[in-house]
Amino acid sequence: MALKEYKPTSPARRHMTVADFAEITKAKPEKRLTKPVRKSGGRNAHGKVTTRHIGGGHKRRYRVIDWRRDKDGVPAKVAAIEYDPNRTARIALLHYLDGEKRYILAPVGVAVGDTLVSGADVDIRPGNALPVRTIPLGTVIHNVETAPGSGAKMIRTAGSFGQLMAKEGGYAQIRLPSGEVRKVLQDCKATIGQLGNVESSSVRVGKAGKSRWLGIRPTVRGLAMNPVDHPHGGGEGKSGQGNPHPVSPWGQKTKGLKTRNNRRTDKFIVTRRRPGVRNTQR
């Protein structure tokens, strides 16, 4: 993937960059592998906003991705590389030898015509899926399960990769893109290689309208609101927030507080993540 730049014909065009989509080989998705997506506008079943800054956006169909890679020993040929509006990574359409078709996330180095396979004793090459116990130490991986057979949960965004660091006592230690080192059972599956569309994080949106196409609404500062709308609102001119600590629109303290509540899985974290560190370039 490469980034396309424009001549500065307008203030938005001056700094806008887009993907060139050179790797895309098929425009329309496989209809049987798609589902409708119903927009929520960030609202729950009662109609209340539970997630701010969501609304609008282009109509999409969800592409059903094979997260489990459970067709062990059945070779599949890469039929196409496609765009997926629901994620940053590209997806690959696989045609299995038995006639079944499935989507997977497309790693770097996988092209149309390649043959991929999953199983315990397959080759270590990009796109193949194996149990972690059969993967050599130091191998670059993505699409990692957190429990055997649960489907991939970690390392799924464009350009990301993890690295197998150690194996001990039925568990394997994997360094995640955030710098966190996490333990998973050695029977969990992972896919070899780094995910494609590596320069996705370098794309510059350029204008507000493009964010609206993506379904992202504006983020308004609490300081710019009225007192009825936010605890930071009101005052004459550019006055301060008026609180000893910044708070959310609902009065909860924000900024600098821990947001992780899932203590149940703390025992699987060997090394905490390092803020500002991300493995997306090799």
From Swiss-Prot:
Keywords: Ribonucleoprotein, Ribosomal protein, RNA-binding, rRNA-binding
Coiled coil: none
GO MF annotation terms: rRNA binding; structural constituent of ribosome; transferase activity
Keyword Cytoplasm in annotation: no
Example GO BP: cytoplasmic translation
Name of one Pfam family that matches: Ribosomal_L2_C
Region annotated Disordered, chain positions: 31-55, 223-282
A GO-annotated cellular component: large ribosomal subunit
The keyword RNA-binding belongs to this UniProt entry's keyword annotation: yes
Compositionally biased spans, kind Basic residues: 34-55, 270-282
SMART domains recorded: Ribosomal_L2 (SM01383), Ribosomal_L2_C (SM01382)
HAMAP family to which the protein is assigned, alphabetical: Ribosomal_uL2_B (MF_01320_B)
Family indicated by similarity: Belongs to the universal ribosomal protein uL2 family.
Oligomeric form and interacting partners: Part of the 50S ribosomal subunit. Forms a bridge to the 30S subunit in the 70S ribosome.
Function: One of the primary rRNA binding proteins. Required for association of the 30S and 50S subunits to form the 70S ribosome, for tRNA binding and peptide bond formation. It has been suggested to have peptidyltransferase activity; this is somewhat controversial. Makes several contacts with the 16S rRNA in the 70S ribosome.
Name of this protein: Large ribosomal subunit protein uL2
Protein source organism: Anaeromyxobacter dehalogenans (strain 2CP-C)
Organism classification: Bacteria, Pseudomonadati, Myxococcota, Myxococcia, Myxococcales
